[in-house]
Regions:
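PLP-dependent class I/II
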Residues: 1-15, 22-29, 33, 37-55, ...
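Conserved nucleotide-sugar phosphate-binding/catalytic loop shared by glycosyltransferases and other
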Residues: 59
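Intrinsically disordered, tyrosine-centered linear signaling motifs in cytosolic regions
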Residues: 62-63, 206
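Conserved N-terminal alpha-helix of the aminotransferase class I/II PLP-enzyme fold
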Residues: 63-98
């Protein structure tokens, strides 16, 4: 059997995740400190776990509606109105998915046809490009620079739009840079899009993890943008529910209807137990969100100060739970730096080029880990620089 001829070219050409590569290497290494995976180290709030247990004890284990439990969709709408000033019809404009990644997949599959172009600001989450390619779309990467605080510039977006452009992905707060887009930034982007037929996929999975003085703003709240925006969010990062696998998409009813049809065939429905647990998360856990954000904020300051004091310039992230230090002064590529650091000091980071070509010269550091782990990792990185004779301008 010639499997090479059987396998679809688009699937064969997919790059393995650069995140998982270093995570897997670290898993087999004794006394390794891995700062590679973006997963909260907090336990899911007890009230949420208890709600999941209660749903099982009451035998609520059957298929839910394909689009999700009505009660959950209603709570999602109440949450979005309360926290994000977004307004949706729970029966027609909300789809509950298996994590935010499935919501992204369903959105791209519903909108993108072969040959359509999808604009992806870069550096970016690793799944956008392969999902686009598998749908027959053409990824168009628009670099976001550190000198612009890793924000998408309207002039760069305008230059990237062609008659074939179908979708713009807006991944803010950003993974891996921690960049956020303020209201005025989003207004400039909306102005560029106003006279086009380009849809927006706004990935807001880190919306609650915002450390600036101004709250998160969704582009869908701007005049004329709700009708062209699919908002993706979920429970993994906000409520420390990564293993529960639950996300959602909200947007115009005609798009959500098509996404639900695809979801129906590909997935059927998101896990029932997770959905009952999520209802409690939305109703009762605003305080837990605030506590976790405060802890991440403290860790963020520790990591940013640590890298800057070593002489490795680190942009101050204002969202998510990642730092993106620049390692160009070491003279190594991102892959070389992360590989040597792992081999010599048993600290796992993710090379910046895993998030696109414009991530070269950087590495991603997740601070969703304990202060003890972060402090020890900073100590080992400092030793690594000294032992390799790297004069990075330590302060």
């Amino acid at each position: 059997m010639d499997y090479d001829k059987l396998i679809a070219p688009a699937a064969r050409e997919m790059r393995p995740s650069g995140i998982r590569k270093f995570f897997d290497l670290a898993a087999d290494m004794p006394e390794c400190i891995s700062l590679g995976v973006g997963e909260p180290d907090f336990k899911t709030p007890w009230a949420v776990r208890e709600a999941g247990i209660e749903s099982l004890e009451h035998g609520r284990t059957r298929y839910p509606a394909n689009a999700g439990l009505k009660e959950l969709r209603a709570e999602i709408c109440r949450y979005l109105e309360r926290r994000m000033h977004l307004h949706y019809d729970p029966l027609r404009e909300v789809l509950v998915t298996v994590g935010g990644s499935e919501a992204i997949d369903m959105c791209i599959r519903a909108i993108v046809q072969p040959g359509d172009e999808v604009i992806i600001p870069e550096p970016c989450f690793v799944c956008y490009e392969p999902i686009t390619t598998l749908s027959g779309g053409v990824p168009v990467h628009v670099p976001c620079r550190q000198e612009d605080e890793f924000r998408l510039r309207p002039e760069a977006l305008k230059a990237a739009i062609t008659p074939k452009t179908k979708l713009l992905i807006m991944p803010f707060p950003n993974n891996p840079t921690g960049a956020v887009m303020e209201r005025e930034d989003l207004e400039a982007i909306a102005e560029v899009l106003r006279d086009t037929n380009v849809m927006v996929l706004s990935d807001e999975i880190y919306a609650e993890l915002n450390y600036g003085l101004r709250p998160h703003v969704s582009i869908a709240t701007l005049p004329g943008m709700a009708e062209r925006t699919i908002v993706v969010n979920g429970f993994s990062k906000t409520y420390a529910m990564t293993g529960w696998r639950l996300g959602y998409a909200c947007g115009p009813a005609p798009i959500i209807k098509i996404m639900t049809k695809i979801h129906q065939s590909a997935i059927m429905s998101a896990p029932t137990t997770s959905q009952y647990a999520a209802i409690t998360a939305l109703r009762e856990c605003d305080g837990e969100i605030d506590k976790m954000r405060d802890e991440y904020n403290m860790r963020r300051r520790l990591v940013v100060h640590g890298f800057n004091s070593m002489g490795l310039t680190c942009f101050e992230p204002r969202g998510a739970f990642y730092a993106f230090p620049c390692i160009k002064s070491t003279g190594m590529t991102s892959q070389e730096f992360c590989t040597k650091l792992l081999e010599q000091k048993h600290v796992a980071l993710v090379p910046g080029d895993a998030f696109g070509a414009s991530g070269e010269g950087y590495c991603r550091v997740s601070y969703a880990y304990s202060v003890e782990h972060l402090t020890e990792a900073m100590k080992r990185i400092r030793e690594f620089l000294k032992e390799n004779g790297i004069n990075s301008g330590e302060q």
